[in-house]
């Protein structure tokens, strides 16, 4: 069994446990916060993730790609320069967030301490990214797997202890829920860095080649900037989406409180359940980026095509049964959160969104590994423009409302998957059935 398959299996098993824990975490949140509180929690979360994405600078991807493509003798010098770059960028990001957050109106309706939580997350996420990227690049997926499970265990334990022993007002309960995220990320930081330090000590006696800081920054940023742009775009869309959905529902005649509740059912229940199988897709993505990067750098295009086929067959193998189960048992699954017929209805209607989302992640990993980050970004822009436009136009129709929102989500995900797949087939000079040549011309534009 090669490293690629081993990495997928290891990460998938760990991610399964992590997703099970995440499922329980969301059940606790749903019961403790209630429908309205869950809507508030899910509405602020995308904005927090947007700030975190900017702080991380997508270093896990750029560092893992550098490590996979380059001589091991270059790794130590690259890591030193990456630390310096991260320290400078983190100082700037923390200062900028401290100044800007008080003026962001999204936080006005929440506990004032939430701003401090977000600021505290910035350095934690930034420095964790270096260790995470290193272990991804050397394909030591066991460290990543343990970190992912550890994060969910700490989050679950903290939530259980806080809500078991104490009773909070709604705004304080939301604050506690977000504070737990910081605690779990700090624990992951400590674990990964302890492993990272031991790994570097093991390499200390080996010969290293010195790199210029300018060259390292240029190479890392060549990947980090477009992938960060892609993540920022996703985070911006996710931050806008709650307000766009609520705005569309208000235009359709739905009351404000009911609109928040419906969005809580959509994002907090239906999407949470539907996204459960995505732990395998995410595992595929993490393993594929360094694997595709290494093969593409060595012009081993047949290996790239092999990895693509493997990812598609794996996705078909688990994706179709998973979506079928969610459709058939939507009622019992949604009742684990709330006894809400709306959530069951949303989960069943979103099956195309969930199925195609499972394909998007490995396809996007293939594009990133091949160096087509810009193409991936354009695909996301166009698909989200179509999706958000449809969501607002159809969602604001009185006879459609949430059905229109879901139609827009499904259409956008199908379009994004199709664009990714078509670009990869064109790059590898193969047909849509993945047959033909494997010599790769560079895509321009």
UniProtKB/Swiss-Prot annotation:
Q: At the top level of its lineage, which domain of life is listed?
A: Bacteria
UniProt name for this protein: Sporulation protein YkvU
What are the GO cellular component annotations? membrane
Alphabetized CDD domains for the sequence: MATE_SpoVB_like
Q: Which UniProt keywords apply?
A: Membrane, Sporulation, Transmembrane, Transmembrane helix
Protein localization: Forespore membrane
Also noted in the record is: YkvU and stoA are cotranscribed under the control of sigma E.
Q: How does it sit in the membrane?
A: Multi-pass membrane protein
The UniProt entry lists the main location of this chain as membrane
Q: Detail the disulphide connectivity of this chain as listed in its UniProt entry.
A: none
Provide the coiled-coil residue spans.
none
Which gene is transcribed and translated to give this protein? ykvU
Q: What is an annotated GO biological process for this record, any one? A: sporulation resulting in formation of a cellular spore
> Could you list the residue ranges that cross the membrane?
7-29, 39-61, 82-104, 109-131, 144-166, 172-194, 237-259, 269-291, 312-334, 349-371, 376-395, 400-422
